[in-house]
Structure formats: C-alpha cells, structure tokens
C-alpha cells in the first residue's frame, strides 16, 4: 500500500500488485492506498503494458476496504503509508516496508521525463520485490512432497 502520489493519482501499489502477481501462483495480492487517488496515470499504464502487465481493469482502492481482514503480510511502499500499521495491528502477521519514491514528485510535465521516472521506478520495484519474494515467500509457495521436501524429490 502507498499514499496517494503527488499528482493525486495512484500507481506504486498497483505496480507492486502486478509485479508480485507475476512471480507465481499461490498468492493473493491486493492493493490499497491511504488517500487513494482517482485513477492510474496513462504513463504508468504505458510503462507497465510495455513490460507485459494489463492495467486496464483495476481501479484504485482505499485501505479501509481491507482494514478488517486478516493478512499474512502488509507491504508499505513509502514511509507515509506506515501510519496504517497502528490501525491494522491486530489483523496483520508481518509488515514489510519499502521506500519507493513518488515518480510525480516535483510536478514534472515533460512526458519523456515522466516516462523515464516511471520506468526507473518499475526497475527498482521489480528488483526489490523479487528479492522480497525470493527470501520471504517462494519457499512457502513451492509444492511439498509427503517427505517434507519443498522441491521435487525422488522418494516415490
């Protein structure tokens, strides 16, 4: 989850959701924002579509939608979003915090520069979220054999 970006749109949590979903099956990844924006900027949709993600269907969602559900992980994508930890403390097993910068901070109006910033954000997010997935989640999601091995074994 993240706080609304400086252009009143929302992109970081949506980007993180799509990136995490691309790493494998077995996860339910939801996205929400504190002060959720109204839409995802076209430049973000364009960069994500160039990387093979479909951004056309989902709309931004407020964190209150998920506040009463139980979660294994809540991932915050900017320091401002960490304020939600107090509200959701009883329903979250583990918090993970990242600090991904707002690609629209500073009010950039040059389209090429916006795209460059969003592309750089995507690259950083993909790298760091994959490291998180690999270190925290992958072992838990792999199929297990009756012997307890979590990779394909030869016991049968």
Positions of PLM-derived features:
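Conserved active-site segments centered on acidic
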Residues: 4-65
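Short glycine-/acidic-enriched loop or helix-start segments at secondary-structure transitions
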Residues: 14-16, 41, 83-87, 107
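Residue-level detector of flexible, active-site-proximal loop/helix-junction positions
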Residues: 36, 81, 102-104
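Cytosolic catalytic domains that perform sulfur/thiol-centered chemistry
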Residues: 66-77, 118, 147, 153
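Phosphate-binding/catalytic loops
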Residues: 85-148, 152, 156
């Amino acid at each position: 989850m993240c706080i609304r970006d400086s252009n009143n749109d929302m992109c970081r949590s949506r980007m993180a959701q799509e990136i995490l979903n691309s790493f494998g099956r077995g996860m339910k990844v939801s996205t929400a924002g504190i002060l959720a924006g109204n839409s995802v900027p076209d430049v973000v949709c364009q960069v994500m579509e160039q990387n093979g993600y479909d951004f056309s269907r989902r709309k931004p969602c407020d964190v209150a939608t998920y506040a009463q559900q139980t979660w294994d992980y809540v991932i915050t994508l900017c320091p401002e979003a960490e304020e939600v930890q107090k509200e959701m403390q009883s329903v979250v097993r583990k918090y993970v915090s990242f600090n991904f910068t707002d690609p629209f901070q500073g009010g950039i109006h040059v389209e090429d520069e916006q795209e460059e910033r969003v592309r750089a954000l995507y690259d950083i997010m993909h790298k760091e979220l994959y490291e998180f997935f690999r270190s925290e989640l992958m072992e838990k999601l792999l199929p297990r054999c009756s012997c307890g091995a979590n990779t394909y074994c030869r016991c049968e």
